[in-house]
Swiss-Prot record:
GO biological process, one term: 'de novo' IMP biosynthetic process
EC primary class: ligase
Subcellular location: Cytoplasm
Source species of the chain: Edwardsiella ictaluri (strain 93-146)
Protein name per the record: Phosphoribosylformylglycinamidine cyclo-ligase
Length: 347
């Protein structure tokens, strides 16, 4: 016989029963995202998904992302309901720029101590984002790792796979001087620049819960979920000659637009064609942030940039408006001189 205490996994800080309770909580919302190509349900060692039969030469497009330190702000403010939408948006918006239809999504949720209510709120948001994007939430991993995170802090990552017809891949190679640039409006800072945002909040001493901006608490502006552009962009791709799409994330205008431009051209953007949403004016003033830094860090109200022939601008804007998007003519493509920058913003 031994006098040693019998230890369990729960004694070490891992509650398997809580994990099972979470799965039971989320089964319903996950089921609502199901696509006909998905085989089986939650609980398997792997998720099975067939390719849609409409594709003759299907090419898979994959992506993974997180939401950065927007998560820290959400935890500090105890607002977890829309972080999942952010997570999906950051992945699916990257896929659609290549013309891909998102097929399925998986998430990774890691925490020091699993709070079932918080995790269920986050995953419900992921399911809501998947429904917006038309992709199935087919599985995920919930990792309770005591000692790795402080208290009930958590981190999330998303993984998405989409499909595009090989002949319809959008890679920017068709962009030409004279092409028009259309902007799709953003819902806020989306999921980028939050380390600077949190620094501005610290330096300014503002409480985002009580500081009002344009009739709403600052927190509402900062935690507005990232807009998911999949449905509108796929519809536009099917009906118009889209030459390129750029999702404005980390690196803002200066770094994301050149990613879809061929050599020898540049994007000329007319700053007078739109007004920054109030949150970006506030951030610039409260943090004394330079104009160049604003365009490098934030989307400044532009979530997606689309290049297409100028003759199609009016019909494209009408189509996007019908889809509920705020869209406007942002600028044009011009010839670039030498090794100069591929983005020029005119004041």
């Amino acid at each position: 016989m031994t006098d040693k205490t019998a230890l369990s996994y729960k004694d070490a800080g891992v509650d398997i029963d809580a994990g099972n309770a979470l799965v039971d909580r989320i089964k319903g919302v996950v089921k609502e995202t199901r696509r006909p190509e998905v085989m089986g349900g939650l609980g398997g060692f792997g998720a099975l998904c067939a390719l849609p039969q409409k594709y003759r030469e299907p090419v898979l497009v994959s992506g993974t992302d997180g939401v950065g330190t927007k998560l820290r702000l959400a935890m500090d403010l105890q607002r977890h309901d829309s972080i999942g939408i952010d997570l999906v948006a950051m992945c699916v918006n990257d896929l659609v720029v290549q013309g891909a239809e998102p097929l399925f999504f998986l998430d990774y949720y890691a925490t020091g101590k699993l709070d079932v209510d918080t995790a269920a709120s986050v995953i419900s948001g992921i399911a809501a984002g998947c429904k917006q994007a038309g992709c199935a939430l087919v599985g995920g991993e919930t990792a309770e790792m005591p000692g790795m995170y402080h208290g009930e802090d958590y981190d999330v990552a998303g993984f998405c796979v989409g499909v595009v017809e090989k002949s319809q891949i959008i890679d920017g190679s068709q962009v030409r001087p004279g092409d028009a640039l259309i902007a799709l409006g953003a819902s806020g800072p989306h999921s980028n620049g939050y380390s600077l945002i949190r620094k501005i909040l610290e330096v300014s001493g503002c409480d985002p819960r009580t500081t009002m901006l344009a009739g709403r608490p600052l927190a509402d502006h900062l935690l507005a979920p990232t807009r998911i552009y999949v449905a509108a962009c796929l519809d536009l791709i099917a009906s118009h000659e889209v030459h390129a799409l750029a999702h404005l994330t980390g690196g803002g205008f200066w770094e994301n637009i050149p990613r879809v431009l061929p050599a020898g051209v540049k994007a000329v953007i007319d700053e007078g064609r739109w007004q920054w949403p109030a949150i970006f004016d506030w951030l610039q003033q409260a943090g004394n942030v330079s104009r160049h830094e604003m365009y490098r860090t934030f989307n400044c109200g532009v979530g997606m940039v689309i290049a297409l022939p100028p003759a199609q601008v009016d019909s494209a804007l009408a189509r996007l408006s019908q889809r509920g998007e705020q869209a406007w003519l942002l600028g044009h493509i011009a010839e670039a001189q030498g090794d100069g920058p591929q983005v020029e913003i005119l004041r």
